[in-house]
Amino acid sequence: MIGAGIILLNSNNEVLLLLRDNKIEIPFPNMWDIPGGKVEDGESPEQAVRREMMEEMSIKNLGEINLFKILKTENLTDNIFWKRLNLNPKVIDLKEGQRIEYFNLERIRKTKLAFNYNQVLESFYSEIVIEY
């Protein structure tokens, strides 16, 4: 499977996370996650991120996004993008998930995230955020 997600970083260096729906039929129910999902046939990972942002949060124009990492495991190739973007979670028209919130690194470290995103975000903060 090929997946794509995006790390949305605000001007306070906090990451926007989505609390996944609490449905037993989905992986990692009721856990915090970065926005994203499965890359569909005929779609690039970047197109998938843009589609998922539209489907999950009604965000139509992300503008330029940056590739952070491509993570490969036995069953998954996960394309992780990032962008600086200040969004107000209270005005986002959330279509999937229970809610969205900004997390700083300290809170991320105290929260078990879906998939392997704790490690991904640790790496992101040390490689990207440190430059700002």
Language-model features, listed with the residues they occupy:
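Active-site-adjacent beta-strand/loop module that shapes the phosphate/pyrophosphate-binding cleft
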Residues: N10-N12, K69-V91, E101-R107, S123-F124
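Short connector loops at helix/strand junctions that flank enzyme active sites
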Residues: M1, P29-I34, L76-D78
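Conserved Nudix-box catalytic region and its N-terminal flanking loop in Nudix hydrolases
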Residues: E14-R51, E55
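Nudix hydrolase/Nudix homology domain
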Residues: E25, D93-Y132
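Conserved N-terminal beta-strand and adjoining loop/helix that marks the start
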Residues: M1-L16
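A short coil-to-beta-strand element that immediately follows conserved catalytic motifs
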Residues: K60-K69
